[in-house]
Amino acid sequence: RIMGILLIIFYILFFFWDTLEDRKYLKKNYLSSLITIISYFTFLYIFWPFLWGNPISNLIETFFTFSNYNWGLKVFYLGNYINADDLPWHYALVWIIITTPITYIIFFFIGFFYVLKIFFKNINSLELSENNKLWNDENQKKDFFMIFFFLSPIISVILFSSTLYGGWRHLYFIYPSLIYLVGSGIYYFYFVIKRYIPLKIIIILFFLVFLHNSYNLIKYHPYQNIYFNSLIKNKASKYFEIDYWGLANHEAIEFIINDSNKDNLSSVTIRTASFTPLSYSTKILNIKSNNLIFQGTTHSNPQYIFTNLHYERNPKYQKKYMIPKTTKKF
């Protein structure tokens, strides 16, 4: 994703700040930093063919396209169908919260405010410090880098009113920084409670959390993309899109194949009553079948009707998505 370029920007900013704090830092590290920056943009150019024609102009164009991308469809969010280019500012934040395990969210906020507290404390003491250091050691430097890298893309998509859809997938690259702050939260939590709770109990608690998350990984595989935490999982389909990519569609097709085999049908017609290219799912079928006929959203007396409840418009007002009340449901 284009916002990933923030990594090198932060690298340059932090290098610049280190230079202001210590003049010898530039002399010691200028060569390695220069190689890093040149290598970054060289590989960016090589592996991004769009830049080959006009690197600077095309890079700028990409940023503007990202912030003003015209998708033209609606997103099902908080129970309403909203234009993708007119989503509420909190869209990405809400999706991050509801699709991240509760324990991660708790420790993330602990780590987030812990690091933020140190950051503002260091800012307030800048004038009193002889060296004017924004961080006291390398660990604090990493903490600040991660919190900036987590916040900046989110703030950017909010300020630029970027077009988002399909959850927060456009921001998945910030997940490592989220996990880093979760780790900071665990560290701070342990530092606080170790005086009151025996180490053995703390280890058992963290082990149980680990087992729970491992269980969910196994349980949802390979459909981790439809994971919702316990805050919303029982009501997720009422307020949010579920399977944007249609990853589970192939199982529905396999069910149809097995069910149609009972009647020895020479061909099977399937109508799609949702916004998903169902025929694509045939590429990952575990059952071979050459007698499938996909009608799309047309109404031509199909033998089966499929829906994964994903729509680009409110289905109540779309005739193509209507399913007869007499249809037998599986």
PLM region spans:
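Hydrophobic/aromatic-rich transmembrane helices and adjacent perimembrane loops
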Residues: 1-7, 94-108, 155, 165-190
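Short intrinsically disordered, low-complexity coil segments enriched in acidic
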Residues: 1-17, 42, 106, 113, ...
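Surface-exposed alpha-helical interface segments used for non-catalytic interactions
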Residues: 10-11, 149, 171, 254
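Transmembrane-lumen/periplasm boundary regions of multi-pass, lipid-linked membrane glycan transferases
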Residues: 12-146, 152-164, 208-251
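Active-site catalytic pocket residues across diverse enzymes, especially alpha/beta-hydrolases
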Residues: 16, 20, 177, 189-193, ...
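Cytosolic-side transmembrane helix boundary signature
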Residues: 19-25, 181-202
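Catalytic lumenal/periplasmic loop and adjoining terminal transmembrane helix
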Residues: 49-53, 58-65, 162-164, 197-330
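Short loop/turn segments at secondary-structure transitions that flank enzyme active sites
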Residues: 112, 179, 311
